[in-house]
Regions:
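Extracellular/secretory pathway-exposed regions associated with glycan biology
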Residues: 1-60, 64-139
C-alpha cells in the first residue's frame, strides 16, 4: 500500500509548472501527506498511485488545499483547484467500477497557510480522507 511521492523545492504559482522542475526527493508514502516538506513555502508534491474502489457506483472526490492542487483520475483531470489562493475545497462526482483506478494529485505551496486534504465519499460511507489501505503504488 501507498503512493509514490515526488517532492520539489521551487517557487511556482500553478501545478502546470511542476513538470518543468526536478524533484529533490522521490519516495513511497502511506497517503497524501505533505508534512515531509523541508520548507514552509515554495515547494510542491506530486503523488502517483492507484485507488481501490470497493464497489461499482458514484463517488465524490474532494480536494482541499492552500495553495493550488489538481486531481487526475484515470488520466482525466477531475478537480482543478489550481492557482495561488487561500484555503479552498473543490469536488467532483464520478461513476466508477470496482477495482483499481490510477490517481495523481499535484500540489504546490507558495506561502502562507499550508494544507492538502484528499477525501472521498460513496454510497456506503460518508466523506472521509482517503485512508492508506485504499492506496497502492502499482498493480
Amino acid at each position: 500500500p501507498g503512493l509514490l511521492a515526488k517532492y520539489y523545492e521551487c517557487e511556482i504559482n500553478s501545478t502546470k509548472n511542476i513538470d518543468e522542475e526536478h524533484p529533490v526527493e522521490t519516495k513511497i508514502v502511506s497517503s497524501f501527506l505533505t508534512e515531509t516538506s523541508r520548507r514552509d513555502s515554495n515547494y510542491a508534491f506530486v503523488f502517483t498511485g492507484y485507488i481501490s474502489v470497493p464497489k461499482d457506483g458514484y463517488y465524490t472526490f474532494y480536494l482541499e488545499s492552500n495553495d493550488g492542487s489538481v486531481m487526475i483520475l484515470n488520466d482525466d483531470k477531475i478537480i482543478d483547484n489550481d492557482g495561488a489562493h487561500g484555503n479552498a475545497e473543490e469536488s467532483a462526482s464520478i461513476s466508477l467500477k470496482a477495482g483499481l483506478h490510477k490517481i495523481d494529485v499535484k500540489y504546490f505551496q507558495l506561502g502562507g497557510g499550508q494544507i492538502l486534504k484528499v477525501a472521498w465519499e460513496g454510497a456506503e460511507f460518508e466523506k472521509q480522507e482517503i485512508r492508506p489501505q485504499f492506496l497502492f503504488i502499482d498493480i
